[in-house]
Regions:
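Glycine-rich segments within core transmembrane alpha-helices of 12-TM secondary carriers
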Residues: 1-10, 200-213
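Flexible cytoplasmic inter-helical loops of multi-pass small-molecule transporters
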Residues: 44-63
Length: 217
C-alpha cells in the first residue's frame, strides 16, 4: 500500500503543482493526512498470544537491548540501515534538483520517483521470498552494493529519458527491499519478544542516515 502511494504521489503532486501552485497542493496533502489520521484511530491490533521460550519470557527490556548492542551482527545491521536511509533519501530528496541541473524536463524526476514507488512493490516481495532461500546477510550485502552501483552509473551516464527510466526501475527494485532481510535477521538472532523494539532502534539509525542524505546531498 505504501508503495502504491509512493507511485501515485509524485504524479499527483506534479500535476497539482502545475495546475494549482504549491499553496493549493499543500492544502490537498493536508486533507489526505487528516483523513489518514482519522482512519488510523480505528486500527487497533487484535490481541494475540505469543508463544516464546522460557529464556525469552525471563529476559527484560534493558537486557534485550544490552544483548543486542553486544552483538557484532546487530551493530552491522544498524550501520547498514544508516547507509540505507542515506541512499534512499539522497535520491528521493535531491533527484528533482539534480535532473533540473542536468537540463532534463521537470517531469523526468517525477517519472523516476513514480517508477521507484511502483517497482518497490516487486523488489520488496521478491526479497522477502529470496530471504527464505538464501542467507539474508548476503542478500543485504548485494543490495547495498547494487544501490551504490546504480547511483554511480546513473550519475556518470549522459542525461536522457531512457537512462532515467532505467534508473527508476533499477532503484525501485532495490528501494525498500532491505527491510525484509533486516527484520528477518533481527528476529533470527534475538527472537520475537522484543523484535519491534530492536528493529525500531535499527530504523532510528535509518532516519539518522536519512537526515544525513537530505542535509549533505
Amino acid at each position: 500500500a505504501a508503495s502504491i502511494g509512493y507511485f501515485l504521489s509524485p504524479l499527483l503532486t506534479k500535476y497539482s503543482l502545475v495546475e494549482f501552485e504549491w499553496e493549493q497542493t499543500l492544502k490537498y496533502f493536508m486533507i489526505f493526512i487528516v483523513i489518514g489520521l482519522a482512519v488510523s484511530i480505528f486500527l487497533f491490533p487484535a490481541k494475540t498470544v505469543i508463544n516464546s521460550s522460557q529464556a525469552d519470557r525471563d529476559q527484560t527490556f534493558l537486557s534485550a537491548i544490552k544483548e543486542a548492542f553486544s552483538h557484532r551482527g546487530y551493530i552491522l545491521l544498524v550501520l547498514g540501515f544508516f547507509v540505507c536511509g542515506f541512499q534512499i533519501t539522497l535520491v528521493g530528496t535531491h533527484i528533482p534538483g539534480y535532473m533540473q541541473d542536468r537540463g532534463m524536463a521537470g517531469w523526468s524526476a517525477t517519472i523516476i520517483l513514480a517508477l521507484i514507488g511502483f517497482f518497490n512493490i516487486f523488489g520488496t516481495l521478491g526479497m522477502g521470498y529470496l530471504g527464505t532461500k538464501y542467507k539474508k546477510k548476503n542478500l543485504l550485502s548485494i543490495l547495498y552494493s547494487l544501490r551504490a552501483l546504480s547511483i554511480c552509473v546513473f550519475i556518470f551516464s549522459p542525461p536522457s529519458m531512457l537512462n532515467s527510466i532505467i534508473f527508476g526501475i533499477t532503484f525501485g527494485l532495490l528501494w525498500l527491499s532491505t527491510v525484509p532481510p533486516t527484520n528477518g535477521i533481527v528476529a533470527q538472532i534475538f527472537g520475537t519478544k522484543y523484535l519491534s523494539t530492536l528493529f525500531g532502534i535499527v530504523f532510528l539509525c535509518h532516519q539518522f542516515g536519512a537526515f544525513a542524505g537530505a542535509f549533505l546531498g
